[in-house]
């Protein structure tokens, strides 16, 4: 094997914790090597060491057989190590060319920037990536997929021999992800080595050559993709086999009382009109392709998106949800798709994030908060939901994605909200945490909570939901339940002009 990267015995300690303990990793030239592990397994820390962001406390980094010690990120870049972070590092106001050459502009003899030369170089890079980029437009005006390719182009413009891709498909459509995989295969053909981090095992089996698994900061093993299967990988990741991710569905009474009734909801002017109801203890799926209207309809329910509605009732009482505050008062809560930017205050503690929706719950006198009571409530919710963190005072931006999602759920439970809208609840979390979220959602429904689930993951829709509203071009094409909830039927209604009996669904 023509090894380009060899990590040997990498150990990293932070105050009070050993983040990595004796990690070994070998990556071959022209190989796509998957790095797997649950959130908190040590993947990010290991990659930050490789990129010069953190120094290792023990161990050796070798590139092409030569030991290296990176004092900073620039040293790693100079050695040919590039990384595309899950959260982009682009300057939104600058165009793609300026982002590619930021801080290292090409200049002529008089010190003037050689704009035409940099533009030609950028055009050549994107041509090699087989992607069309408007080189004059600010990157904020580009699609998420195009921004992803600008990040990759930036790394390649630095002559990266080893490219780290951290969850690169997290915000891409299936077609965009397929294009990315084609680009990765072409880079592989040219001899570029890649470390691919993803929670989607199907992607790893599609594009990777070998897999290294970490668990709890330790090396578990390396295997060839062709010699393993999903069950074996999951067991390596979590230390146990997860035979069934989805808890069994209970049999709900068809005449269960509706807790939310929506009559004639129209999200856009002259758009389709939908009617539906959510029953007590039910998980109702909103399925459909991106842009089908499922998310905009859910946002309209909490007053976060302007919409027309003839009538809306919560537990039989007419309500008018003009804004999220009115929805909160009516007992409707949203767990947004973007936890970090919309669902949490990252720099705040677990306690403060949970308490923020219900500050009056533990108020003393008029203006003072009983901090001890808040802490007790936070501890109870952490134990109830299985939030893994040292204390209630831990900052949420230090938690894994699964634990962050549990904190968002805890916030709504602290407010006694009984109608919950989960928007892409498992995006960016590992397979073990996904199973915990699925179990938690089913436990909540068994206790009488009513849930709307929006998900692009078809197995989640099929495996969790009691009924499924399938959206297409803003219209509910069908309301499926029972044995009708199966992948082919859902996709048929989501992609074809097939109408359910009518568009008034109770």
UniProtKB/Swiss-Prot annotation:
Coiled-coil positions? none
Q: Which InterPro entries match?
A: AAA+_ATPase, ABC_carbohydrate_import_ATPase, ABC_transporter-like_ATP-bd, ABC_transporter-like_CS, P-loop_NTPase
Where along the chain is ATP bound? 37-44
Membrane topology type: Peripheral membrane protein
Intracellular or extracellular location(s)? Cell inner membrane
Pfam families, per database record: ABC_tran (PF00005)
MF annotations from Gene Ontology: ABC-type D-ribose transporter activity; ATP binding; ATP hydrolysis activity
Keywords annotated in UniProt: ATP-binding, Cell inner membrane, Cell membrane, Membrane, Nucleotide-binding, Repeat, Sugar transport, Translocase, Transport
Among the entry's GO cellular component annotations, what is one? plasma membrane
The cross-references to SUPFAM superfamilies, in alphabetical order and at most eight, read: P-loop containing nucleoside triphosphate hydrolases (SSF52540)
Name the catalysed reactions.
D-ribose(out) + ATP + H2O = D-ribose(in) + ADP + phosphate + H(+)
| Domain of life, source organism | Bacteria
Q: What is its EC number?
A: 7.5.2.7
Q: Where is the ABC transporter domain?
A: 5-241, 254-498
Q: How does it assemble?
A: The complex is composed of an ATP-binding protein (RbsA), two transmembrane proteins (RbsC) and a solute-binding protein (RbsB).
Give the family this protein belongs to, as stated in its UniProt record.
Answer: Belongs to the ABC transporter superfamily. Ribose importer (TC 3.A.1.2.1) family.
- State the protein's purpose: Part of the ABC transporter complex RbsABC involved in ribose import. Responsible for energy coupling to the transport system.
This chain's protein is named Ribose import ATP-binding protein RbsA
Organism of derivation: Burkholderia mallei (strain ATCC 23344)
Q: State the encoding gene.
A: rbsA
């Amino acid at each position: 094997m023509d090894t380009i990267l060899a990590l040997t015995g990498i150990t990293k300690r932070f105050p009070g914790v050993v983040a990595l303990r004796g990690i070994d990793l070998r990556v071959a030239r022209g190989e796509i090597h998957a790095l797997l592990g649950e959130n908190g397994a040590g993947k990010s820390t290991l990659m930050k060491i490789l990129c010069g962001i953190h120094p290792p406390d023990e161990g050796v980094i070798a590139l092409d057989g030569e030991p290296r010690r990176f004092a900073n990120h620039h040293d790693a870049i100079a050695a040919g190590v590039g990384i595309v972070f899950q959260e982009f590092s682009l300057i939104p106001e600058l165009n793609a060319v300026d982002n590619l050459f930021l801080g290292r502009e090409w200049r002529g003899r008089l010190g003037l920037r050689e704009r035409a030369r940099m533009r030609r170089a950028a055009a050549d890079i994107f041509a090699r990536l087989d992607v069309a980029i408007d080189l004059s437009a600010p990157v904020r005006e580009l699609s998420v997929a195009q921004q992803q390719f600008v990040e990759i182009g930036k790394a390649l413009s630095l002559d990266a021999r080893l490219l780290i891709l951290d969850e690169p498909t997290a915000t891409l459509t299936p077609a965009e992800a397929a294009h990315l995989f084609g680009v990765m295969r072409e880079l592989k053909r040219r001899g570029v080595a890649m470390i691919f981090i993803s929670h989607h095992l199907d992607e790893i089996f599609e594009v990777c050559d070998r897999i290294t698994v970490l668990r709890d900061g330790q090396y578990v093993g390396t295997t060839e993709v062709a010699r393993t299967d999903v069950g074996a990988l999951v067991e390596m990741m979590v230390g146990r086999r997860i035979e069934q991710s989805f808890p069994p569905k209970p049999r709900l009474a068809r005449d269960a009382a509706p807790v939310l009734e929506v009559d004639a909801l129209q999200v856009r002017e002259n758009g389709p009109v939908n009617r539906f109801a959510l029953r007590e203890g039910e998980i109702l799926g909103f399925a459909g392709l991106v842009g089908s209207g499922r998310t905009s309809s859910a946002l309209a329910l909490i007053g976060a998106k302007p919409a027309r509605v003839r009538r809306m009732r919560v537990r039989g009482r007419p309500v008018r949800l003009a804004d999220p505050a009115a929805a909160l008062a009516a007992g409707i809560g949203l767990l947004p798709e973007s936890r970090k930017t919309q669902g949490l205050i990252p720099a705040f503690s677990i306690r403060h994030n949970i308490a923020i929706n219900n500050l009056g719950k533990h108020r003393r006198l008029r203006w003072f908060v009983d901090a001890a009571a808040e802490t007790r409530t936070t501890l109870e919710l952490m134990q109830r939901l299985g939030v893994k963190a040292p204390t209630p005072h831990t900052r949420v931006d230090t938690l894994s994605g699964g634990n962050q999602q549990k904190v968002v759920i805890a916030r709504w439970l602290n407010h006694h909200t009984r109608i919950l809208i989960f928007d892409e609840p498992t995006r960016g979390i590992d397979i073990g945490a996904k199973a915990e979220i699925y179990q938690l959602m089913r436990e909540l429904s068994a206790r009488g909570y009513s849930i709307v689930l929006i998900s692009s993951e078809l197995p989640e829709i099929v495996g969790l939901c009691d009924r499924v509203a399938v959206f297409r071009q803003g219209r509910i094409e069908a309301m499926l339940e029972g044995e009708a909830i199966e992948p082919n039927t859902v996709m048929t209604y989501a992609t074809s002009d097939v109408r359910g009996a009518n568009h008034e669904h109770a």
